[in-house]
Design a protein with these regions (language model features):
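Short, conserved loop/helix-junction motifs that constitute active-site signature segments
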Residues: 23-24, 44-48, 71-73, 131, ...
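Basic, amphipathic N-terminal segments that precede the first structured/catalytic domain
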Residues: 19, 42, 50, 55, ...
Length: 236
């Protein structure tokens, strides 16, 4: 599966009538925050692929557009506080915003992030029972603690994200928030089984979507065999 990840800055070659020529082969778009709704809506309309997003700390509560005011991008799926399965079987979860540094919106304390991370656990456990794994793609705006983050308070990483990576081992953790102005800034780090990637601007990524392991089908197979035997014996 091919993913187009975008974050933080609008790019002319994406907000362009020719975007489908360059990115028409992607299967999914992931937006990691601080992008206007009209930008995400344009990508959806041009590529005709599902877009999943979280909000960044600079997101507007209400955005005016040609179709009138709206509180979310039309046609996109907000991942904040959710653990979901895509129609292709990709398991996604997300948390918005960044560490609180003033009274602005979409900012949370480290303690609040811990609470939100723990709230994802039931959904991730359900994923494990149904799909044989917890999570494929973790989507956040802020970065994990001491991974791609900075020392100033607005750009400090989130400690709870490190825990989510360690325990649930997603294949990808996509984030934004950290602007990349120099070539020597690290934007990709391997943490165990997880590739942590700063999607500032855009990134094209590939994800291998695992199939369900056979043992998850075994209870259904046993039940089906039992029903077939009962039918043969005319007991049902």
């Amino acid at each position: 599966m091919k993913i187009l990840a975008v974050s933080d800055v609008e790019l002319g070659f994406i907000y362009s009538p020719t975007v489908a020529q360059r990115f028409g082969d992607v299967d999914m778009i992931v937006a990691c925050g601080d992008l206007p709704y009209y930008y995400m809506e344009f990508i959806i309309s041009m590529l005709d692929k599902p877009l999943y997003y979280v909000r960044g700390n600079h997101a507007s509560k209400l955005e005016e557009g040609s179709g009138g005011p709206r509180r979310a991008p039309w046609g996109a799926v907000d991942l904040h506080h959710k653990a979901i399965a895509d129609e292709r079987g990709v398991l996604l979860a997300g948390l918005e915003g960044c560490v609180r540094y003033n009274q602005g919106g979409y900012q949370y304390t480290q303690a609040q992030y811990w609470s939100m991370a723990f709230s994802l656990v039931p959904g991730l456990m359900a994923n494990r029972a149904i799909h044989g794994r917890y999570l494929d793609v973790l989507v956040t705006h802020a970065s994990p603690w001491k991974i791609h983050d900075m020392d100033d308070r607005p750009h400090q990483g989130v400690k709870a994200f490190n825990w989510l990576i360690k325990v649930f081992q997603p294949a990808l953790h996509l984030h934004g928030h950290i602007h990349v102005y120099r070539n020597n800034i690290e934007t990709e780090t391997q943490v165990g089984k997880t590739r942590v990637i700063n999607a500032y601007g855009y990134r094209e990524l590939y994800l291998d979507v695992p199939t369900r392991p056979d043992y998850l089908y075994e209870p259904k197979r046993k039940a089906r065999r039992y029903i077939d035997e009962m039918k043969r014996e005319k007991k049902i």
